[in-house]
UniProtKB/Swiss-Prot annotation:
Keywords, ordered alphabetically: Carbohydrate metabolism, Cleavage on pair of basic residues, Disulfide bond, Glycoprotein, Glycosidase, Hydrolase, Polysaccharide degradation, Signal
Record: active site: 199, 202
Protein name per its UniProtKB record: Glucoamylase I
CDD domains: CBM20_glucoamylase (cd05811)
Pfam families found in the cross-reference section: CBM_20 (PF00686), Glyco_hydro_15 (PF00723)
Organism: Aspergillus kawachii (White koji mold)
Length: 639
């Protein structure tokens, strides 16, 4: 008997389910369109071809087109790293049009790393300079410097792309171009992590949870990347455990302290951002790295979110089980203190991450630390471990999903009618405020949307790096700095038929390496003898030809957890942003385990909320598992 028949017999398609689907379908539809808006807006803010940033050099990520009240027409190392990491993940999942943007960014950072600035030069602290002019020159005005999260985040972004290159056999590009740049940033992190600097909001000069968390991640994955390119990072290996040891000191017993050396309460979305940007899909609910589903991170989520409930008029009358608009920290006075789009989206994203982790491990645990978080959403919550097969688990997961979606719905409500996202929205009337078209806001939308759809990045190695010494030590280590000039990208990665010369100049002299490549196309497979890695996950794009009418939406459901375990309310929404009358294409890209076999179907949610299943039989698919094969496409037609 088909799954569709079973549904009919069990009576699952009822008014209650229709109401759930109605709310989800409305948000799904907006997110499908908004994701396209966000991707376009990000590219509009990247030089040299970005429509909104005339004058910015190639590959430079501009924070916002706003040049007055406030003037954000600069490039920040932190923001750029976070944005490019988002694009790298999209590229890994099949958005190959982003290739040149990522390459141009990496090339620009080779220049930026070598620019002398008020924080120093390449090997004397200059990598901690927070922002630069869009023409790749130093900004010399007064500013909160240094900011030590930037090099770590830039390293993470470049490692992500470097790993894609390695997974597809392009070892020379990863080794000769990406690794020397990453090595510089890892050297900075290892040398300066134990020194104070300004936090991500550029206001507190002290020690910041977000900074320390992303520094730990960068050194862990940096060491693994070094090994993958045939090198090593001893300074990564010696400092990562000490950084993790220090990270534990931010836990107060009930929430994560955002900054030492601050007179504030310490409740700050700095900590939510730290959790989501160190999320590892292979990790458990580990308190030591404050994984999104960990008791500490969930308790902190409640404390931070609740700190905004009473201070914004927008949040009046909302219960503890309802999402609210979220700002940076409750004492904020910038623009009179308002909710931020990226902060509100971070609150949602942490919960989507947690849902993914619970689903993967097949259970959730409630401890004394996290009990208040769960009780606010499910009054019957009690300490214990609940299997995914239990009714309590299902009820809690449903409540958390609804809570998470509530934050995204707030963003939908206050986004401009054309989808534009500024930095902030007014705490009283919800109107957009501060810098327009903030690049980070758009990146936050894309990452939250991906996590909502169970599209996750690769592991960064948390499971092998979650222990620390018995006694913390104030240490540092010296690495290797070298200037890098990228004259062009190899044809196997870029446009074909080019010659690449990467020149690396270190403190001990000059080492030049040249590579001539004759591969004809960026889509061809390298024929070199370089070893090739078999990916553990594959980005599978489902292309469906289906003629629809206005108000209808298409979802993908299937027999595995990534496709909702046949639950229609957990189906994956397809996008129609490429739909035309001559080519009615719906599509979605989902990251699935390599070698996984499963059954699936598409469903159509009508404008009246009714659900229509495809005709039988169930479709079947096995995810490829082969050397260098990290993407795949399935082409179907509605039946």
């Amino acid at each position: 008997m088909s799954f569709r028949s079973l549904l009919a017999l069990s009576g699952l398609v009822c008014s209650g389910l229709a109401n759930v689907i109605s709310k989800r379908a409305t948000l799904d539809s907006w997110l499908s369109n908004e994701a396209t808006v966000a991707r376009t807006a990000i590219l509009n803010n990247i030089g040299a071809d970005g429509a909104w940033v005339s004058g910015a050099d190639s590959g430079i990520v501009v924070a916002s087109p706003s040049t007055d009240n406030p003037d954000y027409f600069y490039t920040w190392t932190r923001d750029s790293g976070l944005v490019i990491k988002t694009l790298v993940d999209l590229f890994r999942n099949g958005d190959t049009d982003l290739l040149s943007t990522i390459e141009h960014y990496i090339s620009s950072q080779a220049i930026i790393q070598g620019v002398s600035n008020p924080s120093g030069d390449l090997s004397s602290g200059g990598l901690g300079e927070p922002k630069f002019n869009v023409d790749e020159t130093a900004y010399t005005g007064s500013w909160g410097r240094p900011q030590r999260d930037g090099p770590a985040l830039r390293a993470t972004a470049m490692i992500g792309f470097g790993q894609v290159l390695l997974d597809n056999g392009y070892t020379s590009a990863a080794t000769e171009i990406v690794w020397p740049l990453v090595r510089n940033d890892l050297s900075y992190v290892a040398q300066y992590w134990n020194q104070t600097g300004y936090d991500l909001w550029e206001e507190v000069n002290g020690s910041s949870f977000f900074t320390i968390a992303v520094q730990h991640r960068a050194l862990v994955e940096g060491s693994a990347f070094a090994t993958a390119v045939g090198s090593s990072c001893s300074w990564c290996d010696s400092q990562a455990p000490q950084i993790l040891c220090y990270l534990q000191s931010f836990w107060t017993g009930s929430y994560i302290l955002a900054n030492f050396d601050s007179r504030r309460s310490g409740k700050d979305t700095n900590t939510l951002l730290g959790s989501i940007h160190t999320f590892d899909p292979e990790a458990g609910c580990d308190d030591s790295t404050f994984q999104p589903c960990s008791p500490r991170a969930l308790a902190n989520h409640k404390e931070v979110v609740d700190s905004f409930r009473s201070i914004y008029t927008l949040n009046d009358g909302l219960s503890d089980s309802e999402a609210v608009a979220v700002g940076r920290y409750p004492e904020d006075s910038y623009y009179n203190g308002n909710p931020w789009f990226q902060s509100t989206l971070a609150a949602a994203e942490q919960l989507y991450d947690a849902l993914y982790q619970w689903d993967k491990q097949g259970s959730l645990e409630i401890t004394d630390v996290s009990l208040d978080f769960f009780k606010a959403l499910y009054s019957g919550a009690a300490t214990g471990t609940y299997s995914s097969s239990s009714s309590t688990y299902s009820s809690i997961v449903s409540a958390v999903k609804t809570f998470a979606d509530g934050f995204v719905s707030i963003v939908e409500t206050h986004a401009a009618s054309n989808g534009s996202l500024s930095e902030q929205f007014d705490k009283s009337d919800g109107d957009e405020l501060s810098a327009r078209d903030l690049t980070w806001s758009y990146a936050a939308l894309l990452t939250a949307n991906n996590r909502r759809n169970s599209v996750v990045p690769p592991s960064w190695g948390e499971t092998s790096a979650s222990s620390w010494p018995g006694t913390c030590a104030a240490t540092s280590a010296s690495g290797t700095y070298s200037s890098v000039t990228v004259t062009s990208w190899p044809s196997i990665v870029a446009t074909g038929g080019t010659t690449t010369t990467a020149t690396t100049t270190g403190s001990g002299g000059v080492t030049s390496t040249s590579k001539t490549t004759t591969t004809a196309s960026k889509t061809s497979t390298t024929t070199s003898s370089t070893s090739c890695t078999t990916p553990t996950a594959v980005a599978v794009t489902f292309d469906l030809t289906a003629t629809t009418t206005y108000g209808e939406n298409i979802y993908l459901v299937g027999s595995i957890s990534q496709l909702g375990d046949w639950e229609t309310s957990d189906g994956i929404a397809l996008s129609a942003d490429k739909y035309t009358s001559s080519n009615p294409l719906w599509y979605v890209t989902v990251t699935l385990p390599a070698g996984e076999s499963f059954e699936y179907k598409f469903i159509r949610v009508e404008s009246d909320d009714s659900v229509e299943w495809e005709s039988d039989p169930n479709r079947e698919y096995t995810v490829p598992q082969a050397c260098g094969e990290s993407t795949a496409t399935v082409t179907d037609t509605w039946r």
